[in-house]
Amino acid sequence: MFKYKKTTLACLVAVAAAMSSGAVLAQTIKIGMTSALTGPYNEFGEGNRRAVELAVEQWNAKGGINGKKIEIAMLLDDQLNPDRAVQNMRSILDNKDIVGIIGPAGSGPTLAVIDMAQADGRPYMNPIAQTPVVTYPGEKTGEKPRPNVFSFALQNDVEAVAMGKYLATHFKRIGVIHESTAYGVTGVDYLSASIQKNGGQKPVATDSYNQGAQDMTAQVARMKRANVDAIAAIGLGKDLAVLRRTMARLNLDVPLVASNGALGQPYQEGAGDLTLGTLGTMIGAFGKPMRPATAAFAEAYKAKYGTDRWWGNDPENPQLFMAISVSNGYDAANILFEGIRIANSTKPKDIIAAIESIKGYEGVNAIYNFSKDRHHGIETDGVKVFEYVQKNGKIRLEPIAQ
């Protein structure tokens, strides 16, 4: 009797120890995600959700990671609202079963959560937020990154190189209108520096607006008074459409050269025929010809979701905007999973070291190379300037020679 009790007690202690170490709970590899799944800017968050779910399905179809299936254990909606993002991130960080995190769909909510995510230490994938301070708190890309943060965004210092070069070589009196977020404010500094580095003049006028602004009369009127010969704009698609309509209403007939937000469905839907002539910067992954990894992703996305809003209007060809609304999330998830596979561990330090060892990874948006100092993936050689043109009665985007 005593022997039985002793054996039983030993078993119970062993089970308790196993449970406390997570051995019983770790039947799946769990990730957490907060993004703008609904709300006025859900083209980013919902697009990323679709991409991450596709990546999870593909890995699980091959047996998961080292024999364990992947699970999106927490998928939370922040509507691109910083306060909601903070609440969501706290919930995710409180769940100690979460192995890796995929962050919000914009600089505002991301900056609201990034310090707590860094302090937590688990691998954090930044799919979209463009301000470099998300990854490099000293704001100098390639130096002293946050230890656990990896970026798949088109950083606005990278975007500014292509945008500034085009503006400097084509216009003399440039006006800049930007959103008032960290993305917009830092973007102006990078853009102005890029214009001047390429031999152009400092912008003659600068103004800002709040995300969701319904009227930009004051901003456009200021540009008109400054006699600009082009407007450079940094913002999201819905807001850039308001800007373009305001330019038309006030008869300011100058080119609009915009950040990547102008190349997506929200801008096209909001600006209509006024999109013609608009120029914008974008990762060129979905231009022709596509690399094999990009073409394979496009085929898999179309098979799962069809030619939906994120695919775009052309049933045969995905829109360029997928690179910053969908496939960035796909690449972020795949690099996280590849890091876990290489590490053969779910310990944060092991996964981070494994991701830093990744070289020559064929992603959708880029070929990724990470290191201890390099935690971002997109470089200037992958960014191009595109223009809305009309061919055969249809409005389409085409790359321009620089």
Segments and roles (model prediction):
Residues 1-11:
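Bacterial N-terminal signal peptides that target proteins for export
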Residues 11-14, 24:
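Cleavable N-terminal signal peptides
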Residues 19-26:
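Sec/Tat signal peptide C-region and signal peptidase I cleavage site
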Residues 32-53, 75-83, 105-106, 177-185, ...:
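Extracytoplasmic "Venus flytrap"
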Residues 43-50, 62-139, 152, 209-216, ...:
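Beta-alpha junction/loop-to-helix N-cap segments that form part of ligand/metal-binding clefts
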Residues 87, 132, 139-251, 269, ...:
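Extracellular/periplasmic Venus flytrap/periplasmic-binding protein
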Residues 247-330, 384, 388-389, 395-400:
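Extracellular/periplasmic periplasmic-binding protein-like sensory domains
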Residues 306, 310-398, 402:
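Segments of small-molecule ligand-sensing domains
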